[in-house]
């Protein structure tokens, strides 16, 4: 019990909260539970340990990121700005 065809794991909420919310939860959780690329070894082996904590199962690298994604939009912007500043030097 707890799964449905349309909303997957968000089916655990049953008829509560409405379809839109349950679809959003299902979408976020499906991406969150996927394996992501490691920033150290570049393998698809990063799994979520806890809220904002991510660990690579191959190289053991542990790092912080977003609650649902290992890299947030803000992190991408900062990384791009740093890279650009280093190139200008």
Swiss-Prot record:
Note describing how the cofactor binds: Binds 1 zinc ion per subunit.
* GO molecular function annotations of the record: large ribosomal subunit rRNA binding; structural constituent of ribosome; zinc ion binding
Q: Does the keyword Repeat apply?
A: no
Q: State the needed cofactors, names only.
A: Zn(2+)
Family annotation (HAMAP family): Ribosomal_eL43 (MF_00327)
The record, for PANTHER family, names: 60S RIBOSOMAL PROTEIN L37A, LARGE RIBOSOMAL SUBUNIT PROTEIN EL43
> What is the protein's given name?
Large ribosomal subunit protein eL43
| Gene, per the UniProt record | rpl37ae
